[in-house]
């Protein structure tokens, strides 16, 4: 017992679990508050798993929509790694646990792991005081819209893989970082862009922070002599490529995850600026307006 008390990782995990428990207790308290205000009798599971959570639950139970299905909103837009993990856990439990509970267990475990390694990374890579590093789990568990990280959504798993990617990257464990990037790209398509962070960090570690034609040339030559580093880069988008290969086999369109999204919306926005402008001016759904103003505030 004394060894556990003196173990830094155990102490950190205990602090994170206490913050996590408080945050989830607040969520539970909000259920009767919501029902009292709205005059409803909805359960915690119902309130926590709205919108796309139902799509993920369907995929966990039944798999992806067959190409001959009449539903125009085919669920190919949802990447598979989170679903695979949930389906595996459901299989292990013999299907006795509600699908939404399974998904929430996976999401909550993922966000706890993310918080743990985020704090560890901050301690190793910065001079921030220890008490200030605990702001990270508070934000991950209690910030607006972090309820998604407790629901049947990919957010928690995606955040976990991103945190682990940067944790291993700064530990110079490039292959482990590449695998985390591959997992993130199998969770959400934007995980593919982590390959650029890996290449930049490799350049900094091998050539320093200054950029010149000569140094770039040297970097390329050095990389060609280091097959493990090249492999760590090539692995990064593997999750997305694997899903695209599946879609090509399953429905004949490797880009189906992108093409099917027209069934949800036809409008196109200029990245970041266009979305924020339309969100903050109330041109899209109210929930995006709230998120838009929150993004500007932080």
Residue ranges and their predicted role:
Residues 110, 130, 134-169, 183-194:
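Multi-pass, polyprenyl lipid-linked donor-dependent membrane glycosyltransferases
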Residues 126, 130, 165-176, 206:
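Membrane-interface transmembrane helices that cradle and orient dolichyl/undecaprenyl
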Residues 97-101, 118-142:
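Transmembrane-helix signature of polytopic, membrane-embedded enzymes
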